[in-house]
């Protein structure tokens, strides 16, 4: 009987993995279906021109869908943006904060609000994409074959439906598959661009534009970078939490100690994404405008990839968003109050404000190290891309996303296997009894 249960659990895991792969194949298939009314030749020339702007970054996150202007051109980004906005508002807006405390019911309502906001943001972004496409003219002609009201309406509907479909696929993966669906959709998009980036690098090496030694060094550097990311993402500070003893009749319960882990990089991959978006926005606007003014030229030059001003601002913004997002993700006061509610305490710290201040003290130091780590991981590839013209798909943000998603998915698979074995063991014990 126990063997049958173990086999059933194993089959369930395999089915979940197959379901996840099937959903991701649908995502990749949709990224090659273009929206109607686009001249693909003219679009390719525009995509090549803007591959190092904000369009290049979002094209990387969408797995090339934006460059091909497919039905998934907006990718899952409107949903992520909506989720972050709702998360930010839940800190400042009291009704949303109260909704968070309602448990599973409140979580469902917040998810529903995120979906509504996703549709709204996707509609605005889709309309902006339609207007931008209509304004693009290349040597081969305009990007849009027949501009006008009908093109805008069909583009908005197509892109919004594409985003909703991706959002639904992500939710299905989370519920019925393995891993976080949204993260896996971004992951598969980034991974899809890696083979072409590797081929491009070795092609440059073959033609003599890039030294073979440098190409090998870059490959070794990538392996080291992945190892460093894994080390820092797994790094955590464990705080001792003590529970008081209590006597019930003649028996004494409690008194055990446990640990509260605080991640070194609490903010995750959000700071580099936000910092990149803000810095690349002015240069993208400059590339869209037809103005050849000195101001625009100077802006494009100083905020270009690998330039000292760009690197400095990039590091400053990463550090700022590291602190900002950590403060949102981890509420020191709320955590301290929860510990006090359950009678737990940090040894040597009084429950309440003293514990909250201690959390802030520890988190500040962790966030400084985490911010420096994120800055180094993101800046080194920027310098390499600027010097050796390596594809944006091998940027620091890409590495962070890919490694984090792989680690999270592996952890979930291990947890699933462990829980299956535990359930099988409990079932055997019950049968013996």
UniProtKB/Swiss-Prot annotation:
Any one of the GO CC terms: plasma membrane
Keyword field: Cell inner membrane, Cell membrane, Membrane, Protein transport, Translocation, Transmembrane, Transmembrane helix, Transport
One record GO biological process: protein targeting
InterPro entries named in the record: SecY (IPR026593), SecY/SEC61-alpha (IPR002208), SecY_CS (IPR030659), SecY_dom_sf (IPR023201)
Membrane spanning stretches: 17-37, 71-91, 117-137, 149-169, 184-204, 212-232, 268-288, 310-330, 366-386, 388-408
Signal peptide location: none
Membrane topology term: Multi-pass membrane protein
Protein family (similarity comment): Belongs to the SecY/SEC61-alpha family.
UniProt cross-references to HAMAP family, sorted A to Z: SecY
Quaternary structure, from the entry: Component of the Sec protein translocase complex. Heterotrimer consisting of SecY, SecE and SecG subunits. The heterotrimers can form oligomers, although 1 heterotrimer is thought to be able to translocate proteins. Interacts with the ribosome. Interacts with SecDF, and other proteins may be involved. Interacts with SecA.
Physiological role: The central subunit of the protein translocation channel SecYEG. Consists of two halves formed by TMs 1-5 and 6-10. These two domains form a lateral gate at the front which open onto the bilayer between TMs 2 and 7, and are clamped together by SecE at the back. The channel is closed by both a pore ring composed of hydrophobic SecY resides and a short helix (helix 2A) on the extracellular side of the membrane which forms a plug. The plug probably moves laterally to allow the channel to open. The ring and the pore may move independently.
Name of the protein in its database record: Protein translocase subunit SecY
């Amino acid at each position: 009987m126990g063997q049958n249960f173990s086999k059933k659990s194993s089959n369930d895991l395999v089915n979940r993995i197959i379901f996840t792969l099937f959903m991701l194949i649908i995502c990749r298939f949709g990224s090659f279906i273009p929206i109607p009314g686009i001249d693909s030749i003219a679009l390719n020339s525009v995509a090549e021109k803007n591959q190092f702007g904000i369009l290049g970054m979002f094209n990387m996150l969408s797995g090339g869908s934006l460059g091909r202007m497919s039905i998934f051109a907006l990718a899952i980004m409107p949903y992520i943006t909506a989720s972050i906005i709702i998360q930010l508002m839940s800190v400042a807006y009291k009704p949303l904060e109260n909704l968070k405390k309602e448990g599973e019911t409140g979580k469902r309502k917040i998810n529903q609000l995120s979906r509504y906001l996703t549709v709204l943001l996707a509609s605005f972004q889709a309309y902006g994409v339609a207007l931008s496409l209509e304004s693009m003219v290349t040597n081969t002609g305009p990007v849009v074959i027949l501009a006008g009201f009908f093109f805008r309406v069909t583009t908005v509907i197509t892109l919004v439906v594409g985003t909703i479909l991706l959002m639904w696929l992500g939710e299905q993966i989370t519920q019925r598959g393995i891993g976080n669906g949204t993260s896996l959709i971004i992951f598969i998009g980034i991974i899809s661009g890696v083979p072409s980036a590797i081929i491009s690098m070795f092609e440059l090496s073959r033609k003599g534009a890039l030294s073979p030694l440098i190409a090998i060094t870059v490959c070794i550097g990538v392996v080291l970078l992945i190892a460093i990311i894994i080390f820092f993402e797994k790094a955590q500070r464990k705080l001792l939490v003590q529970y008081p003893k209590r006597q019930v009749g003649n028996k004494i319960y409690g008194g055990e100690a446990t640990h509260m882990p605080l991640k070194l990089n609490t903010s995750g991959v959000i700071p580099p994404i936000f910092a990149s978006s803000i810095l690349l926005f002015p240069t993208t606007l400059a590339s869209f405008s037809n103005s050849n003014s000195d101001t625009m030229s100077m802006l494009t030059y100083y905020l270009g990839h690998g330039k000292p001003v760009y690197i400095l601002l990039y590091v400053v913004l990463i550090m700022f968003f590291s602190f900002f997002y950590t403060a949102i993700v981890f509420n020191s006061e709320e955590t301290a109050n929860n510990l006090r509610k359950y009678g737990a305490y940090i040894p040597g710290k009084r429950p309440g404000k003293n514990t909250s201040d201690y959390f802030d003290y520890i988190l500040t130091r962790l966030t400084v190290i985490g911010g420096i780590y994120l800055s180094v991981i993101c800046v080194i590839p920027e310098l390499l891309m600027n010097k050796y013209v390596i594809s944006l798909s091998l940027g620091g943000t890409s590495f962070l996303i890919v490694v984090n998603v792989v680690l999270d998915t592996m952890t979930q698979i291990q947890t699933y296997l462990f829980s299956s074995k535990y359930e099988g063991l409990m079932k055997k014990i019950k049968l013996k009894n």
